[in-house]
From Swiss-Prot:
Signal peptide: 1-15
Transmembrane residue ranges: none
Keyword Protease annotated: no
Residues lipid-modified (S-diacylglycerol cysteine): 16
Topology relative to the membrane: Lipid-anchor
Name listed for the protein in its UniProt record: Curli production assembly/transport component CsgG
């Protein structure tokens, strides 16, 4: 009977073992949240708006906890690129290059110098036009990152055999605002946040099955929601709110007025600030 128990335990533990992957995963497009699907399925505007985005700063001052490097920030520093992508993918705006403006100006100087010297390439013989000016600017920042906002778990153990699970919620918050280039007036502003879920599931056995015979085994699984995807989702949600607010306040309009009751617009229009937990 004891040999049978040992055999069963060994089979169970061997079945729980997972071999490391033989090769790294192939490159793929970045996974996106529901907010991206909503953003790309908004109704069309009467006309696209020229917009400039300079720099979305990280104002949290948070760094990754030990044992990560003390110089690694807790949130990605690529919020500007994420916002430009969200504005373009919404099909409501035409983003103008401003983050790398100096590089663009340098390249234009090189072309003009070549045109003056008569050594310009065929594809650059046409005189350069003036850069397009934006109607509005979208400013903003990452205004908060709180770790361990909520945590918990559950587990049970009986005669040395048991399992448990634990979870932790972090939170990241973003501010976005639309600024009128002509007057400097802030036309619209919104704060959005996204929770970041991390959880762990583990099971194990620690039991003497006979005198001087110890059965010990464990298995576990950990999943951490990528902070980058959560930040991107918060920015995409903020862009949808800005578009919705601009429609309601007459800053811009829909191509088809009947689409004011579009399911996506209605969903975000009726979203309310959740109560403090």
């Amino acid at each position: 009977m004891q040999r049978l128990l040992i055999l069963v335990a060994v089979c169970l533990l061997s079945g729980c073992l997972t071999a490391p992957p033989k090769e790294a995963a192939k490159p793929t497009l970045m996974p996106r949240a529901q907010s991206y699907k909503d953003l790309t399925h908004l109704p069309m505007p009467t006309g696209k708006i020229f917009v400039s985005v300079y720099n979305i700063q990280d104002e949290t001052g948070q760094f990754k906890p030990y044992p990560a490097s003390n110089f690694s920030t807790a949130v990605p520093q690529s919020a500007t690129a994420m916002l430009v992508t969200a504005l373009k993918d919404s099909r409501w705006f035409i983003p103008l290059e401003r983050q790398g403006l100096q590089n663009l100006l340098n390249e234009r100087k090189i072309i003009r110098a070549a045109q003056e010297n008569g050594t310009v390439a065929i594809n650059n013989r046409i005189p350069l036009q003036s850069l397009t000016a934006a109607n509005i600017m979208v400013e903003g920042s990452i205004i908060g990152y709180e770790s361990n906002v909520k945590s918990g778990g559950v587990g049970a153990r009986y005669f040395g055999i048991g399992a448990d699970t634990q979870y932790q919620l972090d939170q990241i918050a973003v501010n976005l605002r639309v600024v009128n280039v002509s007057t400097g007036e802030i036309l619209s502003s919104v704060n959005t946040s996204k929770t970041i879920l991390s959880y762990e599931v583990q099971a194990g056995v620690f039991r003497f099955i006979d005198y001087q015979r110890l059965l010990e085994g464990e298995i576990g699984y950990t999943s951490n929601e990528p902070v980058m995807l959560c930040l991107m989702s918060a920015i995409e949600t903020g862009v949808i709110f800005l578009i919705n607010d601009g429609i309601d306040r007459g800053l811009w309009d829909l191509q088809n007025k009947a689409e004011r009751q579009n399911d996506i617009l209605v969903k975000y229009r009726h979203m309310s600030v959740p109560p403090e937990s």
